Structures are given as C-alpha cells and as structure tokens.
Amino acid sequence: MNQWEELQESVGFDFKDVELLKQAFTHSSYVNEHRRENVKDNERLEFLGDAVLELTVSNYLFNKYPDMAEGHMTKMRAAIVCEPSLVEFAEAVHFSKYVRLGKGEEKAGGRTRPALLADVFESFIGALYLDNGIDKVVTFLERVIFPKIDAGAYLQTVDYKTQLQEIVQRDRDVLIEYDILGETGPAHNKAFDAQVIVNGQVLGKGSGRTKKQAEQSAAQFAINQLTHR
C-alpha cells in the first residue's frame, strides 16, 4: 500500500482522481523543485476549500442553533475555521506526514508550520469536494469538526489575547509583547505572521488576514502550549 492508498483508507474515501488528492498535499516549494514533473501546488484547492468549509460549517450552525443570533454564529464560525483550529483538525487526521515539500522547506520545519498545515486541511476539503461532492465533505466533517461543535467547544468565543494575559499573570507580573514578523500575498489578500513573547520567550506564532487576527492566532497557540504542558 502506497502513501496515497493509505491516506484514502485513513480518511475513508476513495478518490476517482488520485492526482487531485496529491495536489492537495503539494506545497509550492515542491513544485519549484520538480518543474519537469508538471505537478501543481495546492493553492487553488485551498482557495476553494476555504469557501466550501465556510459554507458547510455555516449550514451546520444555522441548523443546529435555530435561535442563535447572526453575530454569535459569525463568531463561532470564525473560531472553527481559524488557523489554530484548522491545524488541530489536520493533526487529528495526521495530514502532515503526507505533505509534499521542497527540500529547503522541509529543512526549515515546514512540515509542522501551522499556516502550512491549515492550508493543507483547506486544500484537502477543496479536493474532496471536487472529487466526491459536498455530501462527502459533510460526512468527513461529521467525523472531524462537528462533534467538537456538538460538545460545545466553540460556544464561548474568546478574546485570546485577554485570556493569555489572565493565565500568565495569575502568579506574577509578566511582560507580554506581540511582534508582526512579516506579511505575504497580494495587496487584496494579505496574510500577516505574528508571534507572542512572554518575558523574552516566544510562546506562540500564528497568522491571519489582519495584524489583529495574527496576534489573536499567536495568543491561541500560546494558550494551547501552556495548557498542554
């Protein structure tokens, strides 16, 4: 059994177009190093998967919480499809082992980079939608995401920066700093990378469509680090 057969068995779906599945796990760095192979990266599938994920999660929340206000559903959806949550979902189904990376990206630790794993999860959703249809996407989410919603994991939408401050300042005074590490993407679709530093130690990194979202993402990763020690 090769890795793609193993992956299909793991997720419980057979792909009619296995090349589409491979593309979902192909980072641009791999494409740059294998130009003669005529392979495609997963960026377009990520774009599609992002939209499919928002639709399916929105539909689930709409039906599960018939009396919930639009604003609250919007906050819940944002918590579900944010980068830290997507990384958690990707790790739960062991997606990192299947990612195709260039040698440089591999050496730089790309296989465990949060933004990369989040992108792979979205690109897989895009590929699954194209190959198997929306019903199979829902079936997959019924295993990976919807049980967490049912358990109430996202009912309390949190300001992660405030929560982090409350956690680290319980016993002592500390200095919390946020740094914007850089930005990527075109002007109309930028992504920002941020890190949070507590008393000189980097505790979390994250990214987002705005600087504030990136800082919130970094704070959420820091909280996960502190609460799982």
From Swiss-Prot:
EC nos: 3.1.26.3
PROSITE patterns according to UniProt: DS_RBD (PS50137), RNASE_3_1 (PS00517), RNASE_3_2 (PS50142)
InterPro entries the UniProt entry points to: dsRBD_dom, RNase_III, RNase_III_dom, RNase_III_sf
Active site: D50, E122
Domain named DRBM: residues: 159-228
Cofactor(s) required, per the database record: Mg(2+)
RNase III domain segment(s): 4-133
A GO BP annotation: rRNA processing
GO cellular component term of the entry, any: cytoplasm
Top-rank EC class of the record's enzyme: hydrolase
Primary site of residence: cytoplasm
One protein family per Pfam: Ribonucleas_3_3
Alphabetical keyword list: Cytoplasm, Endonuclease, Hydrolase, Magnesium, Metal-binding, mRNA processing, Nuclease, RNA-binding, rRNA processing, rRNA-binding, tRNA processing
Annotated compartments: Cytoplasm
Keyword flag Nucleus: no
MF (Gene Ontology): double-stranded RNA binding; metal ion binding; ribonuclease III activity; rRNA binding
Recorded catalytic activity of this chain's protein: Endonucleolytic cleavage to 5'-phosphomonoester
Amino acids binding Mg(2+): E46, D119, E122
Similarity remark: Belongs to the ribonuclease III family.
Task performed by this protein: Digests double-stranded RNA. Involved in the processing of primary rRNA transcript to yield the immediate precursors to the large and small rRNAs (23S and 16S). Processes some mRNAs, and tRNAs when they are encoded in the rRNA operon. Processes pre-crRNA and tracrRNA of type II CRISPR loci if present in the organism.
NCBIfam families, sorted: RNaseIII
PANTHER family: RIBONUCLEASE 3, RIBONUCLEASE III
UniProt subunit comment: Homodimer.
Record protein name field: Ribonuclease 3
Gene that encodes it: rnc
